[in-house]
């Protein structure tokens, strides 16, 4: 009988593919925890928005993040640019030293908290969820295998310094590359597997809940193929999980924000990435959801 139960359990595991155990831990009232937030995804998570345009568009932000925000510290593996130490959030932590990502806007929200917050950013421009992170059958792929150990190492480094890290959630800005794949509706299954694995692998540092903030990919009908299918998959996942939130970026639906692409120069417009003010807004919106 026991062997039959074991066999049945194994069959169920094969059928479900990515079901894993995950149980948020209870907070110890005797411990002061240090809040950690994750940023993952592709180029609009890495950040291709040019910071110099904020010198005139948002002088206060430009001055603040040229110097650095001491209340929010970040470490990152961003397009193979690696910062293993936690340093103040500032400009230049994007796709290259001239660009920034959602960490700037998110820091504006996190710095309102009483204590220091930490961001771990693990992103790769052009990366595809279903072929490079986790596929719909539950197979872990190269960027999952790269970034999750990096995140765990950074959490352990906080522990070694006497901190008590608590992973509060993640902002996920990805999906553009997946729009080129066939069977786009499978994005939902892949995302579900990805988050199931991630929460399981980081379970040691998750207390009470894990907020997941997703964002629509830009729907302009030029760069991406049927982006509405990817966005529907994202919305479906968030609708099913009480601690998941989806940022609508089309500016039309209720509660949506309006983002604009990089058309800040006289050069060829960049139809794949957000302009500087839009990236600020995206990061702030993600921050407001992730601290709920």
List each language-model region with its residue ranges:
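Cell-envelope and extracellular/periplasmic
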Residues: 22-292
